[in-house]
């Protein structure tokens, strides 16, 4: 009896769509779900497909060619551990488990270590692109044993999104948790992108009172230039979508932005690594403060502030906001990739930053034209400390920083909250400062806690008795 080439555990929408994606490339796929009904539903809805259902873990595992390749698409956390534990009694040494969930990278490091000790291969794999990407081609970020990756690479390359140059959006990221870490930072960058766009929207509404049709036209024009990206593209569509009553849908959506925690993970990791991930962290905080709707409504009746004054030069202001958005985006990516470098050093992953940018070019939520500029920057100088120092990005900063400053100044003077746009210029100015006022902070630390300090004019470590 012939055996299937790969198995998928978890028939929720992402697992189902990935199974269908794999099947569409000519593979036979064993499918299993903890609840029998879900498996039966998938099979009933996809008659004629090379999906073979199994209703016990043992039968599912035994249906696969060896070394077995099993893709887990189950709820991250305890659900993943439970699924792995159910599989292990039936696996042979050398079999490969691929975790495609939104898993915290430290969990992936642990599972890789534990399964390796038992002779199994474990590949923690970031998958970006949502439901449509899973079905038609996502961006895929696998990390784990390199030799195990080579055994699943043919399948992953066939199901991945394809960039304009024909290259699949998948590459080996690095050992143990590297793939899930890169996916985590991808999600953090996604948070930053979305908040920057939301602030541009607030500025255009507050400063120019643009109609939804005008906003859509503006974003359509932006999408034809430097800002060309998936998120700008969908935003132009969102502005003009109406509900069944003829109302613009975006105008009646409650202004509370939810989150699944991956942005928080990125910010927490930045603190662990000592990385100034200020813009992305502000985007996480912006979602948190948006959730304080009742408090904000009450505060709006108590706390005073300026009323936004209309801007005279409409075209000029739109261009300033566009430039501020693009430079803010560059700062966000500079912070994100700087954190990838710090993590690579900390966890010995030897990440290839140019390759990472390349696999973001299609399939994923942050896909954008300018990602090629990041790949180019690392091709020119693989050891560059920060993307802001690369010639292209330095030139953009030279040309666009005044617009960013003007937009932030307008927002502050007119009471429009722009936490990520503000964070962008604060980071830029801090990073370009040869001298910061941290000398005073270090003096304070030595004053109250004898934490010592270094001097600019002498070698060594010093402590002063400040009250003598």
From Swiss-Prot:
One of its GO terms (biological process) is organic acid catabolic process. Transmembrane segments: none annotated. PROSITE patterns: 6PGD (PS00461). Disulfide bonds: none annotated. It catalyses: 6-phospho-D-gluconate + NADP(+) = D-ribulose 5-phosphate + CO2 + NADPH. Substrate binds at residues 102, 128-130, 186-187, 191, 260, 287, 445, 451. NADP(+) binds at residues 10-15, 33-35, 74-76, 102. It is an enzyme of class 1 (oxidoreductase). One of its GO terms (molecular function) is NADP binding. Keywords: Gluconate utilization, NADP, Oxidoreductase, Pentose shunt. InterPro entries: 6-PGluconate_DH-like_C_sf (IPR008927), 6PGD_dom2 (IPR013328), 6PGDH_C (IPR006114), 6PGDH_Gnd/GntZ (IPR006113), 6PGDH_NADP-bd (IPR006115), 6PGdom_BS (IPR006184), NAD(P)-bd_dom_sf (IPR036291), Pgluconate_DH (IPR006183). Pfam families: 6PGD, NAD_binding_2. Signal peptide: none annotated. Its EC number is 1.1.1.44. The active site is at residues 183, 190. Pathway: Carbohydrate degradation; pentose phosphate pathway; D-ribulose 5-phosphate from D-glucose 6-phosphate (oxidative stage): step 3/3. Catalyzes the oxidative decarboxylation of 6-phosphogluconate to ribulose 5-phosphate and CO(2), with concomitant reduction of NADP to NADPH. Belongs to the 6-phosphogluconate dehydrogenase family. Homodimer. NCBIfam families: gnd, PRK09287.1. PANTHER family: 6-PHOSPHOGLUCONATE DEHYDROGENASE (PTHR11811). This is 6-phosphogluconate dehydrogenase, decarboxylating.
């Amino acid at each position: 009896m012939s055996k299937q080439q790969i198995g998928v555990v978890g028939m929720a929408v992402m697992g189902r769509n990935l199974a269908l994606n794999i099947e569409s490339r000519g593979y036979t796929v064993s499918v299993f779900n903890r609840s029998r009904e879900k498996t039966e539903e998938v099979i009933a809805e996809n008659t004629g497909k090379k999906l073979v259902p199994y209703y016990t873990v043992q039968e599912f595992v035994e249906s696969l060619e060896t070394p077995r390749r099993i893709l887990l698409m189950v709820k991250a956390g305890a659900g993943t551990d439970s699924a792995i534990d159910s599989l292990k009694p039936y696996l042979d040494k050398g079999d490969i488990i691929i975790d495609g969930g939104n898993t915290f990278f430290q969990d992936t490091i642990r599972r890789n270590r534990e399964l390796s000790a038992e002779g199994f291969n474990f590949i923690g794999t970031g998958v970006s692109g949502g439901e449509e990407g899973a079905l038609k081609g996502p961006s895929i970020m696998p990390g784990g044993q390199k030799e195990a990756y080579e055994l699943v690479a043919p399948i992953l390359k066939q199901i991945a999104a394809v960039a304009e140059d024909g290259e699949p959006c998948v590459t080996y990221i690095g050992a143990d948790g590297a793939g899930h870490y890169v996916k985590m930072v991808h999600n953090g960058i996604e948070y930053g992108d979305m908040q920057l766009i939301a602030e541009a929207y607030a500025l255009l509404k507050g400063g120019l009172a643009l109609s939804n049709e005008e906003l859509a036209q503006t974003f359509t024009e932006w999408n034809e230039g430097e800002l060309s990206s998936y998120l700008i593209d969908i935003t132009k569509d969102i502005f003009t979508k109406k509900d069944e009553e003829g109302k613009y849908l975006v105008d009646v959506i409650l202004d509370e932005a939810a989150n699944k925690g991956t942005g928080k993970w990125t910010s927490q990791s930045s603190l662990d690594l000592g990385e100034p991930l200020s813009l992305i962290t502000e985007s996480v905080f912006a979602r948190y403060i948006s959730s304080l709707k009742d408090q904000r409504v009450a505060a709006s009746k108590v706390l005073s502030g300026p009323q936004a004054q209309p801007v005279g030069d409409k075209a000029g202001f739109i261009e300033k906001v566009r430039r501020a958005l693009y430079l803010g985006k560059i700062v966000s990516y500079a912070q994100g990739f700087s954190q990838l470098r710090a993590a690579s050093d900390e966890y010995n992953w030897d990440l290839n930053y140019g390759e990472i940018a390349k696999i973001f070019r299609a399939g994923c939520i942050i896909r954008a034209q300018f990602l090629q500029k990041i790949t180019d920057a690392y091709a020119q100088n693989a050891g560059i400390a920060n993307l802001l120092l690369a010639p292209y990005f330095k030139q953009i900063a030279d040309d666009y920083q005044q617009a960013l400053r003007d937009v932030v100044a307008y927002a502050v003077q007119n009471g429009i909250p722009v936490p990520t746009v503000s964070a962008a210029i604060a980071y830029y100015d801090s990073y370009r400062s040869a001298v910061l006022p941290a000398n005073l902070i270090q003096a304070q630390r030595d004053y109250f806690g004898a934490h010592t300090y270094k001097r600019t004019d002498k070698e060594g470590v010093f402590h002063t008795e400040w009250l003598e």
